[in-house]
């Protein structure tokens, strides 16, 4: 009987432990670990397991708290204006632990998600420094690494690991280093590297010529001098990048059919046509100017020409707000208006759309009007 009573007591205690608290209260909150904010409980089948087991970079949580609470004082002088202009904030953890060889630190990140079509507003390297017996100058080397590819050395800078009292984090401005990598990466050779001194003070990087690249790759290739090595965990280092989408001059990256036709030797110029047959040229001048010069015809039936307009997607309205923490909405854009006939390069048409518009120019009933389709898509960074 005593053993049976113990079993029943244990079962009751287990049920009491597993019983939801205040489950009937509307708008129950699930607190996020490491913060005093709460999020609405999910209405899906996963329930409270939505955020279970998830780990968030502390810097991103702090930034999210700043956005929600509107506490601009927590932002640095650089972050405040940049945050207002940025479309996305990306965070990168180290691919491997920081390798410390003597006074040289080697940091590796996979920055493949940073596109050259994005305008880089700010890049901050945040390091939670370990305890040192005595401060000493160190050289921090930054690498771009991706599985199956050779590590790309991006640059280095010198600093002192000492931090201000009451803070264990030190922030470095790597904006110029990443801008060089994004915009001049094709000219980057094995003999060069970028040395950034006092970068957090706004100094410009200097390209230094090196004949031997092994000197800057010691941290990743091995310790040849038997210098004492150490490391600290990946979560102590995070790279935070603020970006903004920018329009590109050519979405396709290669000459379109219109450019190919214009540069063809079989296409006669307007002056050649006029010399060959002046009468026929005058009779068909309007049509030829439309095709050869790619002029935009006037608006038909008072409809505005096709253009990109805003289309705000609100996750709260589509019932996804309880799962998506940030952003709560974004601009997906859409096309509005009538396409001209024929299309010209201003609207960046595909070859199929251009041919289709030419067919419609001569036979209105044979094909339907061209329609806009996305020509460029980019991932949206979200905190779930």
From Swiss-Prot:
Signal sequence range: 1-18
Disulfide bonds: 306-372
One GO cellular component term: extracellular space
Propeptide: 19-283
Pfam families: TGF_beta, TGFb_propeptide
Record GO biological process: axial mesoderm formation; determination of left/right symmetry; gastrulation with mouth forming second; mesoderm formation; regulation of Wnt signaling pathway
Domain of life: Eukaryota
GO terms, molecular function: cytokine activity; growth factor activity; morphogen activity
Record flagged with keyword Disulfide bond: yes
Keywords: Cleavage on pair of basic residues, Developmental protein, Disulfide bond, Glycoprotein, Growth factor, Secreted, Signal
Membrane-spanning parts: none
Residues bearing attached sugar chains per UniProt: 71, 173, 344
Induction text: By dorsal-mesoderm inducing signals including activin, vegt and other nodal-related proteins. Beta-catenin potentiates the response to activin and vegt. Not induced by wnt8 alone, but wnt8 potentiates the response to activin.
SMART domains reported in the protein's UniProt record: TGFB (SM00204)
Subcellular location, record wording: Secreted
UniProt cross-references to Gene3D superfamilies, sorted A to Z: 2.60.120.970, Cystine-knot cytokines
SUBUNIT field: Homodimer; disulfide-linked. Forms heterodimers with the TGF-beta family member derriere. Interacts with tsku; enhances nodal2 activity.
Similarity annotation: Belongs to the TGF-beta family.
Domain observations: The pro-region is necessary but not sufficient for wnt-inhibitory activity. The central region is required for muscle induction activity.
Function, in words: Cooperation and regulatory loops of multiple nodals are essential for mesendoderm patterning in early embryos. Essential for mesoderm formation and axial patterning during embryonic development. Activates the activin-like signaling pathway to induce dorsal and ventral mesoderm in animal cap ectoderm. In addition, also dorsalizes ventral marginal zone (VMZ) tissues during gastrulation. Induces muscle actin. Appears to act as both a short-range and long-range morphogen. The unprocessed protein inhibits bmp- and wnt-signaling.
Protein's name in the database: Nodal homolog 2-B
Protein species of origin: Xenopus laevis
GN (gene name): nodal2-b
């Amino acid at each position: 009987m005593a053993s049976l009573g113990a079993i029943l007591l244990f079962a009751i205690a287990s049920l009491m432990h597993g019983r939801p608290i205040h489950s009937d209260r509307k708008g129950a909150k699930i607190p996020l670990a490491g913060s005093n904010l709460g999020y609405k409980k999910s209405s899906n089948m996963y329930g409270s397991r939505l955020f279970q087991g998830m780990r968030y970079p502390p810097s991103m949580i702090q930034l999210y708290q700043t956005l929600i609470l509107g506490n601009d004082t927590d932002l640095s002088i650089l972050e405040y204006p940049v945050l207002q202009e940025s479309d996305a904030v990306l965070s990168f953890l180290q691919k491997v632990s920081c390798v410390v060889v003597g006074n040289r630190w080697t940091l590796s990140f996979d920055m493949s998600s940073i596109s050259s079509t994005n305008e880089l507003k700010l890049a901050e390297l945040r390091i939670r420094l370990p305890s040192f017996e005595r401060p000493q100058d160190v050289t921090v080397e930054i690498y771009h690494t991706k599985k199956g590819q050779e590590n790309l050395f991006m640059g280095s800078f010198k600093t002192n690991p000492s931090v201000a009292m009451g803070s264990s984090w030190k922030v470095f401005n790597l904006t110029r280093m990443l801008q060089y990598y994004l915009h001049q990466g094709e000219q980057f050779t094995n003999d060069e590297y970028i040395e950034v001194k006092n970068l957090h003070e706004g100094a410009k990087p200097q390209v230094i010529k090196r004949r031997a690249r092994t000197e800057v790759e010691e941290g990743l290739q091995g310790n040849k001098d038997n210098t004492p090595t150490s490391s600290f965990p990946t979560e102590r280092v995070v790279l935070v990048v603020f970006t903004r989408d920018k329009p590109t001059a050519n979405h396709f990256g290669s000459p379109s059919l219109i450019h190919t036709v214009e540069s063809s030797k079989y296409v006669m110029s307007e002056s050649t046509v006029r010399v060959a047959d002046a009468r026929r040229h005058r009779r068909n001048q309007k049509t030829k100017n439309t095709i050869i010069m790619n002029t935009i015809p006037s608006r038909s039936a008072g409809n505005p020409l096709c253009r990109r307009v805003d289309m705000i997607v609100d996750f709260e309205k589509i019932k996804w707000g309880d799962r998506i923490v940030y952003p709560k909405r974004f601009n997906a854009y859409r096309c509005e208006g009538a396409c001209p006939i024929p299309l010209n390069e201003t609207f960046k048409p595909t070859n199929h759309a251009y041919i289709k518009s030419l067919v419609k120019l001569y036979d209105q009933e044979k094909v339907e009007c061209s329609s806009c389709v996305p020509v460029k898509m980019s991932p949206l960074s979200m905190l779930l």
